[in-house]
Each structure stands twice: as C-alpha cells, then as structure tokens.
Amino acid sequence: MFKKEKIKIERKKLLELGRKIETLDLSNSNKYFLNLISLNSELFILIKDLINKEEKTSFISENYNIELKMLYNEYAIKDEQGTIIDFNPNDQTYLAAIQDLNFFYKDEYKSMLDRKEMFNSWLLEEIEIEIVKLDFNYFPNIYISPIIYKYLAFNI
C-alpha cells in the first residue's frame, strides 16, 4: 500500500515544491495527496522550515522599502486633502534623509546580501530524506488531478 524510499534531493527543489503546494487546492478530490502529506510529516516540516528561512533572508529589504516610501510620502508636495500633487527628488532635505537611510542600512544590507548568498549556496546542497509513497498498484482507480500527479511524479 505504501512504500518507504530514501531519495537525495536539493533543498532548493524542496523549497520550490513547498511554494507550489502552498498554491494547490487540496480539496476533497485530492485527499490522497493530503494523506501523502501526513505520511511525510517530517518532510513537510523541513519544507516549512525552508520557507521560513527564505522569508527571513528578505526581511531587511522589505523594511528598507517601507522606510523609503515613508520618506517619499513625508517630503512630497500635497494639496489640502493630503493628496500628493508633486515631488521634487532633488529637494536637499529629502536627499539628506535618503543618505541617512542608506547609511543606516548599508551594513544591514551588505550582511543581508551575504546571508542571502550563503542561503542560496546552502539550498543547492543535496540532502538525503526518507519519503513515503503511495503504491499505485494498490490504488488503480484513484482519480488524481494532473497537477497532483505531477508532484507525485516528482518523487513525493
């Protein structure tokens, strides 16, 4: 009914799989895929951890972009209702504020890029994991949508 198998796979492929699984409609027709997820709980914990690590590597740039938008909004020329009607990117106080922001984030940004580079090379490493697969000889009449079948064919 189920087969256990050890496979070698790049962490990056697991991360891609995790991203695709997040977008799948795991409705009732795909309950066998849900069973596969529960049988492979350790694998999916690993995938979730990879997704969290990836999100943490881009956190600093998001903060920088938010602060940049706040500066733009602060120095923009607005009408009485507060609607931005003009903006002078050469305004000296705005340029000084941008310089301060860039100086503050310079080291943060460099360390973020270093972490991202290390993370990307770490993702390319192969790891060995044990997975549980459905043996389709036992389930000849199961309907599995093409998208689910594609991921099952991916060895999961």
Task: Give the residues covered by each predicted segment.
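A composition-driven surface/loop motif
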Residues: F2-I156
